[in-house]
Amino acid sequence: MRKHLGFTLIELMVVVAIIGILAAVALPAYQDYTKRAKLSELILAASSCRTGITEVLQSATGELPKAGNWGCESATPTSKYVAKIETDDSGAIRVQAANTKDTDIDGHWVSLIPRGTTDAAPVLGEAVFKWVCGNPKPVIGSEFVTDIPSKFLPGSCRG
């Protein structure tokens, strides 16, 4: 009787099937992770704008700047995945995604909207209590929305 060395055909087929199942489960999760990583760049781009708007809202004594005049907007790409940054009259920010090679993301927007203590747009001289990020529907004081599916947004930006 000969001693068997190596794997039999059945054992190899089982191993290949297991690897295939693991790949089928892991690949979509990895793809979602890379999309979230790319979108975190949009949140980072809005962060400097958010700081400036918060300072203006808390310290200004005159009239609030109008849409596009908060000093942090950009009509041209500012980084690899950021196409442009816009603001509205209430200080809400929206950032457009680009170059992610995904139709669910490219050309779509992520919004950050300042909220006062009453969950409405903050008034001049009032502290910004929180920033609402990733809102799929308009909130009081701003028409900006996030139209990127929430599963692709970073955890800190899911409404």
Question: What residue ranges belong to the model's regions?
Answer:
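N-terminal single-pass transmembrane signal-anchor helix
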Residues: 1-41, 45, 49
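Conserved hydrophobic/amphipathic alpha-helical signal-anchor segments
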Residues: 32-73
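Periplasmic/extracellular, small/polar-rich flexible segments of pilin-like filament-forming proteins
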Residues: 58-159
